[in-house]
Amino acid sequence: MQFVLHKTASGVTRARRGTVHLNHGDVQTPAFMPVGTYGTVKGMLPRDIEAIGADIILGNTFHLWLRPGTDIIDKFGGLHKFMHWDKPILTDSGGFQVFSLGAMRKITEEGVTFKSPIDGAKVFLSPEKSMQIQYSLNSDIVMQFDECTPYPATHDEAKKSLELSLRWGQRCVDEHKKLGSTNALFGIIQGSMYADLRKQSLEGLLEIGFDGYAIGGLSVGEPKEEMIDVLDYIANDMPADKPRYLMGVGKPEDLVEGVRRGVDMFDCVMPTRNARNGHYFVTGDVDNAGVVRIRNSQYRTDEGPLDPECDCYTCQNFSRAYLSHLNKCKEMLGAQLATIHNLRYYQRLMQGIRDAIEQDKFDEFVTEFYSKRGQTVPELNLR
């Protein structure tokens, strides 16, 4: 992997424009990665994902390991051929999914024992096993196995958790090298909401050495102000010559705020999940902060496109009234068209950000973004 930093925005922001060169292609940053949990972005054919402009998608190590299993994916030479996607893939390590199991799991120094959510069977996942699974998947970016610190956590709990993740991180690097993988391996910064612990985690990861660094343990129930606070004091301390990835955070305004603080990569289920629930992101809707809730009665007879500024297949061919009808009838096509639009909205947002950075107009872009949503630009408190 190679990361090329092309430009840093002028002004007070830390926005960056770059390219991540990976085994299956290049990723233009800042980038948003659609989530394909089971080897599919819900409701999207691979050609649809390419058409909306995505350079990279995310797969889920935990779920793909349990079903269909790496024995089957191995027969295809990895996840790319299995799902007919020839561009880059990032896979998470399974750490967040294990965290979400709650009482169904037991964490030790060696790894995590848990009951399979599929059949209740006892399963063990370790740093080494996570690396082996991701090696079989042949993902372009492999994530270290970590413990996602719950929120809220005491300082002592967060410290013990991050130190366990650091020890696991070293084991991940050792196993990654042992396997002879040529794919990139990213470390994950933990430490809950504590500035000193986030710094300790980052310093520990830098000592181990990774190809890129991610900010984990956010979007787990904390107030948005605390999430932004973490970004304010940790993002700029991350190496400038490596990609910076904010995990699982994905409201449009969160992406903009992350970029303002120097983040390069994002992922979230929000655009696809919200699409299935009738919430569509649009460029300009002052009254509704950039969201059309298609189930509202006002759209039943609306002949206009979902978003007049959008170039996606949905907006170019269908009315809000038709989308309202499909949603009301729970038609499969409705969810598919909504997903196409929401993911295209996210890719257009990131393209606009990249163009603005290149043209030294990022501050103007941010002002216009919030203005179209009827919001004021949040204050930057960089440290």
UniProtKB/Swiss-Prot annotation:
* EC numbers, comma separated: 2.4.2.29
Which sites bind substrate? D92, S93, G94, G95, F96, D146, Q190, G217
Q: Which reaction does it catalyse?
A: 7-aminomethyl-7-carbaguanine + guanosine(34) in tRNA = 7-aminomethyl-7-carbaguanosine(34) in tRNA + guanine
Q: Quote the record's binding site residues for Zn(2+).
A: C310, C312, C315, H341
Q: Where is this region: RNA binding?
A: 248-254, 272-276
Q: Which GO terms describe its cellular component?
A: cytosol
Q: Name one GO molecular function term.
A: tRNA-guanosine(34) queuine transglycosylase activity
The answer to keyword Transferase applying to this record is yes
The annotated pathway is: tRNA modification; tRNA-queuosine biosynthesis
Q: Which residues form the active site?
A: D92, D267
Q: Which Pfam families match?
A: TGT (PF01702)
What InterPro entries does UniProt report for this protein, alphabetically?
ArchSynthase1/Queuine_TRR, TGT, TGT-like_sf, tRNA_ribo_trans-like
* Cofactor(s) of this protein: Zn(2+)
> In which family does this protein belong, per the annotation?
Belongs to the queuine tRNA-ribosyltransferase family.
Q: Which HAMAP family match?
A: Q_tRNA_Tgt
Instruction: Briefly state the protein's biological role.
Output: Catalyzes the base-exchange of a guanine (G) residue with the queuine precursor 7-aminomethyl-7-deazaguanine (PreQ1) at position 34 (anticodon wobble position) in tRNAs with GU(N) anticodons (tRNA-Asp, -Asn, -His and -Tyr). Catalysis occurs through a double-displacement mechanism. The nucleophile active site attacks the C1' of nucleotide 34 to detach the guanine base from the RNA, forming a covalent enzyme-RNA intermediate. The proton acceptor active site deprotonates the incoming PreQ1, allowing a nucleophilic attack on the C1' of the ribose to form the product.
What this protein is called in its record is: Queuine tRNA-ribosyltransferase
Naturally occurring in which organism (per UniProt): Psychrobacter arcticus (strain DSM 17307 / VKM B-2377 / 273-4)
Q: Gene that codes for this?
A: tgt
